[in-house]
């Protein structure tokens, strides 16, 4: 079996330290903590009141509002970081064979925010005709959906 060469040409990052790779790196070398008070949900009933949340993130930098509504927040992070990596690589996508371009990213659980919203929303509604889940519930939630959204 012949091994193919892989070349990393660009990097991107969305982290609690910053929404770009330079911001994140700056935070790392300066010993900055990404931890702070939980703001994404009401954590008043939990012992822990702090987390490492991504702050100041604007998904509309890489996609329109209509597309962004179909994605869980983690997918928006992945898509944005992939776009940063493409920009960092200074690739002219009109001149590249897109079948030879790939992005590697990792997520432990996927769309937990979507899962939370749907399940908690369902628990609050007493409806005799059954559950009324968002039709994008599963596509937004599954962890491999972010790599299906193209930025190229």
Residue ranges, per PLM feature:
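Conserved "HGTGT" condensation-loop signature of ketosynthase/thiolase-family condensing enzymes
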Residues: 1-152
């Amino acid at each position: 079996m012949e091994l193919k060469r892989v070349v990393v040409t660009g990097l991107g990052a969305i982290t609690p330290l910053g929404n770009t790779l330079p911001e994140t790196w700056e935070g790392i070398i300066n010993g900055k903590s990404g931890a702070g008070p939980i703001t994404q949900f009401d954590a008043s009933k939990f012992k822990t009141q702090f987390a490492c949340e991504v702050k100041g993130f604007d998904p509309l930098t890489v996609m329109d509002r209509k597309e962004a509504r179909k994605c869980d927040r983690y997918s928006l992070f992945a898509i944005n970081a992939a776009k940063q990596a493409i920009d960092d690589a200074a690739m002219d996508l009109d001149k590249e064979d897109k079948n030879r371009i790939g992005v590697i990213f990792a997520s432990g659980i996927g769309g937990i925010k979507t899962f939370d919203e749907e399940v908690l929303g369902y628990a609050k509604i007493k409806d005799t005709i059954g559950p009324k889940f968002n039709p994008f519930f599963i596509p937004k939630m599954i962890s491999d959906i972010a790599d299906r959204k193209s930025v190229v």
